Amino acid sequence: MTIARRPSCHAVENSIGLAAPAEAVFDYVTDVRREREWNPQLREAEKLTPGPVGVGTRYRVRFGRGVGAAIIENTAFDRPRGWSAVSTSRRLDVRFRGQVTGLPGGCQLGVQTELSPRGALRVFSPVLRQLMRRSWDKDLAAIKAIIER
């Protein structure tokens, strides 16, 4: 999967190499119910749609740090290469793309997060972008530690 759209100035891109098969990494990171294992900001995640994870899968989630409740929906799903999702909340909408590239001995996990803050939160866009970049660096390191156990 390639990222066709050019990211806005509010987009954050992060990546990490993993010593694990692309399929295992993809399956782990695309199931939002498992995100609490590596994202300390996620408090709750409930899958709202029946069946396997794929396009149209929706989750109700609750984050800490002022984001609160959100609905996440997968908008593209190309196992094990890439996926896209949107998250809608009262204060912040997020467009997300993930890409898993197979490499000798493992894979590369890349994520792109595009933030669309609402209302007064818009003035904090540069700060939000920096927080998101740091948060993804920590989250990717946690994913790596879990996957490579």
Region locations from a protein language model:
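A short, structured loop/turn motif at beta-sheet edges
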Residues: 19-23, 50, 75-80, 99-108, ...
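Hydrophobic/aromatic beta-strand elements that line small-molecule binding cavities or substrate pockets
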Residues: 14-16, 47, 61, 70-76, ...
